[in-house]
Amino acid sequence: MVTIEDKINLFSKIIYGEVDDKINSELDELENVEKDTIEKEEREVKKYRNKNMQSVEKKIKSKFEKEVFKLKLEEQQQLLNLKENMINETLESLKERIIDFTKSDEYINYIKSHLDNTLKDIENKEGIIIYFNKKDLEKFKKVINKDNVEVSNESKDIIGGYIIQDKNNKFRVDCSLEISIEECKEKIGISITELFM
């Protein structure tokens, strides 16, 4: 049976391929712009060197270094912006796929299985409340009938999954799909950063 992790991993591989192509294309473009700018500055330096004295040459060299430094800073900023945009696009695409997943029959089985496993790990189930989003509340309220476990009529603003909490607010187990997305965010960020190295 294909798990959500398998789907996320497959999706990540597909996205990484697309991201890699996009990165390489944009890096080539940035390198060409930097190369053209550097060549232009070098021509200016040679022209001034031939016409002016040594002091003028020092001033031009200083200006050139400042421009190169400025370009490098701009390039770094563009790369940071590109990485951030790629991470956000990937996460948005992942979120859309997860929303589609919540509409499938696999999702119902996933929640039942995941919830059973989560509840097994909780020793004292007295006063436990399970929260779902509005759509899932309708699906699971009748299905989940556990001793000492209450399904709240109050819905949470989550894509899918559930949140378990006790009545005294002493503990909370967040098994919402947003948490899965947040966990993927760091991995996606690391993978995209590695593409630029």
UniProtKB/Swiss-Prot annotation:
GO terms for cellular component: proton-transporting two-sector ATPase complex, catalytic domain. One of its GO terms (molecular function) is proton-transporting ATPase activity, rotational mechanism. It comes from the Bacteria. The keyword Transport applies. Keywords: ATP synthesis, Hydrogen ion transport, Ion transport, Transport. The keyword DNA damage does not apply. Pfam families: vATP-synt_E. SUPFAM superfamilies: V-type ATPase subunit E-like. One of its GO terms (biological process) is proton motive force-driven plasma membrane ATP synthesis. Produces ATP from ADP in the presence of a proton gradient across the membrane. Belongs to the V-ATPase E subunit family. This is V-type ATP synthase subunit E 2. It comes from Clostridium tetani (strain Massachusetts / E88).
